[in-house]
């Protein structure tokens, strides 16, 4: 698999590419299946439909890897939190965590066993996927998942989380540790079900100041990565902490690929990290609105990463109103322009 080879810094015939949120609302085919499912969470839980939408970008765009269709918040959901998605508001937990008692109510022993719909979707997708295409499993980082569990929803300033971080750091560490143990088992089950690679999304990494990022986020991501790498050395682990270009000097640990977001200059990440890791990223997602902007972005990134291990991706998820034609153009352009 070209994607897996690139993760391990092996030579590839061209630069492999996939897109975050590639199974998503910009595809009419996705919208049709989502309509049939009823709502977002029902789609996540219907493993046949989740598999179908995971495969759509392979069939429509010819990307080099599929990522399983799911959501990072199914983990706290199956630990016992009440999750719902409100239109225009995103995810909401009706019972956010603010005390040790709240935390102790959550089931960390059986949560990974209740996520069979994810494993079944992975199994089915791997069966249907051609052998040269990789299948990516994923989870959120403990910190990013915890922000939703504590805030009760998305947040602009993470005031509740940060209040806990500074007033009661022991409780926050207990929450993060509990999540970390569940996520290890969850990812292991994903690998057993057919995932060829794992990505850990730390979407809200940049909410933390320098030292606190390494204490409350990165250390837990590394604990998960160390667990996976010790048991499954042939499974590449991708870490994607978003928005921490100022923290790259201290990025070190046992993982394979560093995901670069679009706000981080790729040459900076290359100079600091490419001797240790393959890099993934990092085109500005809004460039996909315009073919000239796509061409310019692709050329610049391929030039920056010339002769370095690289997986092409956007620097964040594809937006819902991107024309499919532009997404197809982007994928083909990367594969053809980078062909050795």
UniProtKB/Swiss-Prot annotation:
It is an enzyme of class 4 (lyase). InterPro entries: UROD/MetE-like_sf, Uroporphyrinogen_deCO2ase_HemE, Uroporphyrinogen_deCOase. It comes from the Bacteria. GO terms for biological process: protoporphyrinogen IX biosynthetic process from glutamate. GO terms for molecular function: uroporphyrinogen decarboxylase activity. GO terms for cellular component: cytosol. Substrate binds at residues 21-25, 71, 148, 203, 316. Its EC number is 4.1.1.37. It is found in: Cytoplasm. It catalyses: uroporphyrinogen III + 4 H(+) = coproporphyrinogen III + 4 CO2. The keyword Lyase applies. Pfam families: URO-D. Transmembrane segments: none annotated. Pathway: Porphyrin-containing compound metabolism; protoporphyrin-IX biosynthesis; coproporphyrinogen-III from 5-aminolevulinate: step 4/4. The record marks 71 as: Transition state stabilizer. Its main location: cytoplasm. Coiled coil: none annotated. Keywords: Cytoplasm, Decarboxylase, Lyase, Porphyrin biosynthesis. Catalyzes the decarboxylation of four acetate groups of uroporphyrinogen-III to yield coproporphyrinogen-III. Belongs to the uroporphyrinogen decarboxylase family. Homodimer. This is Uroporphyrinogen decarboxylase. It comes from Campylobacter jejuni subsp. doylei (strain ATCC BAA-1458 / RM4099 / 269.97).
């Amino acid at each position: 698999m070209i994607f897996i080879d690139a993760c391990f810094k092996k030579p590839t015939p061209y630069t492999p590419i996939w897109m975050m949120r590639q199974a998503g609302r910009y595809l009419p085919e996705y919208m049709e299946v989502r309509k049939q499912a009823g709502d977002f969470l029902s789609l996540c839980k219907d493993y046949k439909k989740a598999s179908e939408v995971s495969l759509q970008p392979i069939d429509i765009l010819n990307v080099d890897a599929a990522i399983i269709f799911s959501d990072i918040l199914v983990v706290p959901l199956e630990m016992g939190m009440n999750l719902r998605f409100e239109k225009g508001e995103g995810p909401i937990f009706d019972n956010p965590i603010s005390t040790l008692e709240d935390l102790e109510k959550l089931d960390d022993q059986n949560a990974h066993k209740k996520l069979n719909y994810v494993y079944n979707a992975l199994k089915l997708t791997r069966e249907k996927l051609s052998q040269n295409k990789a299948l990516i499993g994923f989870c959120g980082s403990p910190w990013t998942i915890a922000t939703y569990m504590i805030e009760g929803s998305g947040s602009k300033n993470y005031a509740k989380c940060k209040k806990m971080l500074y007033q009661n750091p022991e409780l926050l560490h207990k929450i993060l540790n509990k999540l970390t143990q569940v996520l290890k088992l969850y990812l292991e089950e994903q690998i057993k079900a057919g995932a060829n690679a794992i990505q850990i999304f730390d979407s809200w990494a940049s909410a933390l100041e320098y030292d606190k990022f390494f204490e409350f986020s990165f250390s837990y991501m590394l604990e998960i990565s160390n667990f996976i790498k010790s048991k499954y050395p042939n499974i590449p682990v991708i870490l994607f902490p978003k928005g921490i270009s100022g923290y790259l000097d201290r990025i070190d640990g046992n993982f394979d690929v560093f995901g670069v977001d679009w706000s981080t200059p790729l040459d900076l990440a290359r100079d600091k990290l490419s001797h240790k890791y393959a890099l993934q990223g990092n085109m500005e997602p809004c460039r996909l609105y315009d073919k000239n902007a796509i061409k310019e972005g692709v050329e610049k990134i391929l030039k920056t990463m010339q002769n370095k291990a690289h997986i092409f991706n956007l620097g964040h998820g594809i937006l819902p109103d991107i024309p499919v034609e532009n997404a197809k153009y982007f994928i083909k352009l990367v594969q053809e322009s980078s062909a050795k």
